[in-house]
């Protein structure tokens, strides 16, 4: 992902075909049948293939291990590993014009020596959310559950539904297109769940997004009411969820109970 304003006009690099779908009305997305679909989907991937890490250049592995280990722990936790299959994580020493991106089942992280471990993990989780969106919820498996999320706020890829406000999105970056809305909301749910829920109590749209991840992806108590934020104040506006400070040690301790 990137923080540059000009990226408003760019979409996530992905091989997913962009097309118009007939989506469920938002108020219908939490019906009993949909919850059964989510359970079936979780079972379908229960024995999914693992993930692999790759380093560029090859001799960068030793230097990067402290970074890759924290993302490894995240992917290995019971809350997450059910959705991981055939995933490749590339750790690059060199910088690029973005900190991370996801394409073709590969998450690529760039210039990590210039990132704190907290920012590295937040960006990696954001990119993993794109993997969940594009591949775990892929259309050919039962049906594309991502469309239920898009239908909450979006008419098409970059066209919002009428009447929506800034407060109906978790960040400025989430407002750029439906894919970034999904990834930013996923990251917010994992790292700042209590914060997310507090805001959702003031926005029906945000509450639907919060409940979407609660119903379709996470078990009922995974991350719920957890908050790894360092600052207690809940801000009205965030530009980028990956820039919000959080306590990485508390997060890793929370994940370890599932590893």
Please give the residue ranges for each predicted region.
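Auxiliary, metal-adjacent structural segments of Zn-dependent hydrolase domains
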Residues: 39-107
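N-terminal low-structure segments adjacent to metalloprotease catalytic domains
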Residues: 1-62, 188, 211, 217, ...
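Active-site-flanking segments in enzyme catalytic domains
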Residues: 80-259
């Amino acid at each position: 992902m990137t923080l540059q304003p000009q990226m408003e006009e760019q979409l996530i690099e992905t091989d997913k075909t962009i097309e118009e779908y007939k989506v469920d009305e938002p108020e219908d997305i939490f019906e009993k049948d949909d919850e059964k679909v989510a359970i079936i989907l979780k079972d379908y991937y229960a024995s999914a293939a693992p993930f692999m890490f790759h380093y560029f250049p090859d001799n960068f592995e030793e230097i990067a291990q402290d970074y890759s280990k924290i993302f490894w722990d995240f992917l290995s936790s019971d809350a997450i590993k059910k959705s991981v299959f055939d995933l490749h994580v590339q750790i690059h020493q060199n910088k690029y014009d973005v900190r991370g991106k996801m394409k073709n089942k590969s998450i690529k992280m760039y210039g990590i020596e210039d990132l704190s471990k907290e920012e590295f993990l937040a960006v990696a989780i954001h990119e993993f959310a794109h993997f969940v969106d594009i591949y775990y919820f892929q259309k050919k498996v039962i049906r594309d559950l991502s469309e239920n999320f898009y239908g909450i706020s979006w008419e098409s890829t970059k066209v919002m539904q009428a009447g929506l406000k800034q407060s109906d999105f978790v960040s400025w970056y989430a407002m750029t297109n439906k894919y970034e809305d999904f990834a930013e909301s996923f990251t917010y749910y994992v790292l700042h769940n209590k914060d997310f829920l507090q805001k959702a109590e003031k926005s029906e749209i945000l509450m639907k997004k919060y409940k979407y991840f609660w119903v379709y992806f996470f078990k009922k108590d995974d991350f719920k009411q957890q908050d790894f934020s360092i600052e207690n104040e809940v801000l009205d506006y965030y530009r980028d969820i990956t820039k919000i400070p959080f306590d990485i040690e508390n997060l890793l301790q929370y994940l370890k109970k599932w590893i």
